[in-house]
Amino acid sequence: MKKMFVALCMAVALAGLSSCKTAQSAASTLEALDGEWKITTVEGQAITPKPGEAEAIIGFNVKEKRVYGNSGCNRLTSALQADAKKGTFTFGAAASTRMMCPDMDTEQKVLTAMGKVTGYEITKDGKLVFKAEDGKAVMTLEKK
């Protein structure tokens, strides 16, 4: 009986420790988002600033649970809505400036793609990939 009790206690302790590791790795994944990321592709097409456009970026402040960035013309900000454990991510209602730029092509592509994002993955080579509900890459970003 005593051996069974000790074995049960060890099993409970081991289960508790493994859940701590999961929580830590989830937090680590979210922390990996922290900072600014340059948008390199949208829907498989390379994104390069055209004359009059700013560099398209998305930044994360994980501590403040905030997303900010520039979609090529306008600045934007939103709440960070992510679950690192599940790899889910959505952009909340975003506030944006309303400037008109000579070419709004990048702006349109970025904002349309942002509306499709439901998940994310950080690849082995350090790229951030936003994914749509079907699992396909919507945007690829590189850490600045």
Where are the model-predicted features located?
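Positively charged n-region of N-terminal signal peptides that target proteins for export
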Residues: 1-4
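Lipid interaction determinants
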Residues: 9, 17-144
